[in-house]
Amino acid sequence: AAPGSSPHQVYNITWEVTNGDRETVWAISGNHPLWTWWPVLTPDLCMLALHGPPHWGLEYQAPYSSPPGPPCCSGSGGSSPGCSRDCNEPLTSLTPRCNTAWNRLKLDQVTHKSSEGFYVCPGSHRPREAKSCGGPDSFYCASWGCETTGRAYWKPSSSWDYITVDNNLTTNQAVQVCKDNKWCNPLAIQFTNAGRQVTSWITGHYWGLRLYVSGQDPGLTFGIRLKYQNLGPRVPIGPNPVLADQLSFPLPNPLPKPAKSPPVSNSTPTMISPSPTPTQPPPAGTGDRLLNLVQGAYQALNLTNPDKTQECWLCLVSGPPYYEGVAVLGTYSNHTSAPTNCSVASQHKLTLSEVTGRGLCIGTVPKTHQALCNTTLKTNKGSYYLVAPAGTTWACNTGLTPCLSATVLNRTTDYCVLVELWPRVTYHPPSYVYSQFEKSYRHKR
């Protein structure tokens, strides 16, 4: 998770695939907690060649450009305007490139052919002993044995690399897309178990890809990185809203002015009574609300222990933690996609040591905290969210959160209890308060 946040907090996450110049050429976004969403990335092979090496024919094409070059002809008559070749002619694997529909068809043939294909070599995250693999100039594939994935007859693989790369379309599917003059060589990049364990995707990782053809194998480099954005409301920098919200003491109502004596008249007087003007009570300010909290605590104490309220002091604490959690039972809601409040960071801080009572627990609760649990639920596998009912929140060993990610619960040792948050009000007998005042008035002789 982001520093200081709950691992269950939902962010807008974007996985980006970059070219050799580290420009974004393909991206996919979704709302998920960090390190729980590992989609299949499907950029086209030719997208990686945008602004790339001259071999691919796209060195002057910017990222997100449309497929260049003339389309294929529909037949020997050449009915498509501006077409260059009949795409039904026999293909050769010579010059598989990206600059025309005809050459993209050749590239499709190379990447799917059992005797040809492509292979991928990792960049700087490879083991230190792989010194002979070279750098980006050799596409990290300077010698055989550097490849960790790809689609080639020897089936390159690895137990430690972060991704696997394959074709995302069959050759028959790709042929039709190529004839429609579109990008037609999409890849399927999947994260391995090793790749799902690392959290360095924000800075990015890089690979090289080379075609396996006769002669020198042409290649390119590409990268994968993650970006995330907080979806919660931004807190403005400015005056303390609590101070601004406090209301001043109401001024006393002015005394009514004495009525003037009416002039003497021979006419019959008519009694006119003024209509009362309704007055709206002023809205409660922060001070009123805080006082109401203390009054509520007093009423609860007076009902349960009336002898304690004959003379006492009830105080709101002036230092953290300002709240206590009371474990409760409740019915949470289950959502397949993250609701809006899952992206809001909690404004309160609380640890499980400040929770009392017995309530609903979720996860693998250790023996040290099982006293908080009246009922303990296990989560099923899957990607879904458990939202606390209104007026409650989840108190977890990682902090407070309005909703839980089942993915996070299942891949970590996180455990949570459903709680209500109550302000901390301390009780002091009069002797304690008087002693504090006496200390402040004593002076050393």
Swiss-Prot record:
Alphabetical UniProt keywords: Disulfide bond, Fusion of virus membrane with host cell membrane, Fusion of virus membrane with host membrane, Glycoprotein, Host cell membrane, Host membrane, Host-virus interaction, Membrane, Metal-binding, Viral attachment to host cell, Viral envelope protein, Viral penetration into host cytoplasm, Virion, Virus entry into host cell, Zinc
Organism expressing this protein natively: Friend murine leukemia virus
Highest taxon above the source species: Viruses
Entry binding sites for Zn(2+): 55, 86
Cystine pairings recorded for this chain: 46-98, 72-87, 73-83, 121-141, 133-146, 178-184, 312-315, 342-396, 361-373, 403-416
Subunit structure: The mature envelope protein (Env) consists of a trimer of SU-TM heterodimers attached by a labile interchain disulfide bond.
Ranges facing Extracellular side: 1-445
Motif (CXXC): 312-315
An annotated GO cellular component: virion membrane
Name by which UniProt lists this protein: Envelope glycoprotein
Residues the record marks as carrying a glycan: 12, 168, 266, 268, 273, 275, 277, 279, 302, 304, 309, 334, 341, 374, 410
Composition bias, Pro residues: 275-284
Function: The surface protein (SU) attaches the virus to the host cell by binding to its receptor. This interaction triggers the refolding of the transmembrane protein (TM) and is thought to activate its fusogenic potential by unmasking its fusion peptide. Fusion occurs at the host cell plasma membrane.
Entries under InterPro entries matching the protein: FMuLV_rcpt-bd (IPR008981), TLV/ENV_coat_polyprotein (IPR018154)
GO biological-process terms attached to the record: fusion of virus membrane with host plasma membrane; symbiont entry into host cell; virion attachment to host cell
GO molecular function, one term: metal ion binding
Biased composition (Low complexity): 262-274
Region spans: Disordered: 253-286
